Amino acid sequence: GVNGKVNYDTLSRVNTFAHVNHSADQTRLGVLLCINGVGILNSWVKRNVAPEGISYPALNELAATVPIGSEGLSILPFGNGAERMLQNKQVDCSIHGLNFNIHNKAHIARAAQEGIVFSFKYGMDIMNEMGIDIGVIRAGNANLFLSPIFRDALAGVTGTVIELYDTNGAVG
């Protein structure tokens, strides 16, 4: 997010920095939400759970066969080391509510994306505590934002509008 006033999270759960548009006359501070491990969860599911050789679009189609809520399966996506937004705790990734008689690869694919969405929501709540009102998410048309499941869940859970741009993080 970009903020027009000087503030920060006292627990350093998000990173505040001078935005490229910042000047002495106009305060423009960026606030960066770092969620360590969320993208890697989706790629881990693709490599280790989904059928071999599956593409990301096909993985999204597989996940779409499962209803919202993954029939009670949930995944906390923090499996790539300490999490800044969790005060540098290493909580690891965990799967909850797994029922061997109900859940399959499709459920895991959907639950992973839903877990990532809720980690975003948690981080956005931190930003809201700082006075940043997030009504629009502007993102590159890349990575998880290519997934309709992810986009729809993120918009629904956060109450935001998602605007996609023909760019990716490499462009800046």
Spans of features found by a protein language model:
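Active-site core segments that coordinate phosphate-bearing ligands/cofactors
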Residues: G1-G172
